UniProtKB/Swiss-Prot annotation:
Main function: Does not exhibit any ribonuclease activity.
Entry keyword Signal: yes
Lineage: Eukaryota, Metazoa, Chordata, Craniata, Vertebrata
UniProt name for this protein: Inactive ribonuclease-like protein 9
Glycosylation sites (chain numbering): N130, N142
Family: Belongs to the pancreatic ribonuclease family.
PANTHER family: INACTIVE RIBONUCLEASE-LIKE PROTEIN 9 (PTHR11437:SF14), RIBONUCLEASE (PTHR11437)
Origin species: Macaca mulatta
Signal peptide start and end residues: 1-26
Keyword tags: Disulfide bond, Glycoprotein, Secreted, Signal
Highest rank taxon of the organism: Eukaryota
Recorded GO CC terms: extracellular region
Primary location class: secreted
Length: 204
């Protein structure tokens, strides 16, 4: 009879098996996260990005906010800041470590406003970046060991400077959103200020 059931109703049997296994899978995932509903969405997105073989999906507000924005807690000058935060926030590119990353101590809305500031040159051959008008505290992470997760090791650098970002248009919300944090430029240590043209003016 079992053989007849398998041969005549294979799809039904597969669906029943899937339903039986589903609670076990969710129970295992829930033990890793404190707030299941919010974290499950993040976990699904992470798995999708991890397994993706095509182009990386464009960033969303939620993804940028989760990966870049930080709140007061661990001292920003702590030497293991990047190692802990990158693991906690799942900052990876598919199965590889990111070579560099920035964490910013600011509100997402303030970061988004930078997209409408004037253009300035930025590093790594990128021609146009938007620069913050004020100084922002953050941490720069530079990969020092390994290239595949979970063995990524980073050196952490505390910075207080002007944020340079690139932005992209998001059709769903009809506005510019931050795309990439290009740099966090520390001002010269002598007395100076930025004029309206984005040039450092040194005071006598």
């Amino acid at each position: 009879m079992m053989r007849t059931l398998i041969t005549t109703h294979p799809l039904l049997l597969l669906l029943l098996l899937q339903q039986l296994l589903q609670p076990v899978q969710f129970q295992e995932v829930d033990t890793d996260f404190d707030s299941p509903e919010d974290k499950m969405e993040e976990f699904r997105e992470y798995l999708e990005e991890f397994r993706r073989t095509g182009p990386t999906r464009p960033p969303t507000k939620e993804k940028v906010e989760r990966r870049v924005i930080i709140e007061p807690g661990m001292p920003l000058y702590h030497r293991d800041y990047c190692n802990e935060e990158i693991m906690r926030k799942n900052v990876y590119h598919k199965q590889r470590c990111v070579t560099e990353h920035y964490f910013l101590l600011m509100q997402y809305d303030e970061l988004e406003k930078i997209c409408y500031n004037r253009f300035v040159p930025c590093k790594n051959g990128v021609r146009k970046c938007n620069r913050s008008k004020g100084l922002v505290e953050g941490v720069y992470c530079n990969l020092t060991e390994a290239f595949k997760i979970p063995r990524c090791k980073y050196k952490s650098f505390y910075r207080r400077g002007y944020v340079l970002i690139t932005c992209a248009w998001q059709n769903e919300i009809h506005k510019l959103i931050p795309h990439t944090i290009n740099d966090l430029v520390e001002p010269p240590k002598h007395r100076s200020f930025l004029n309206e043209d984005g040039v450092f003016v040194i005071l006598p």
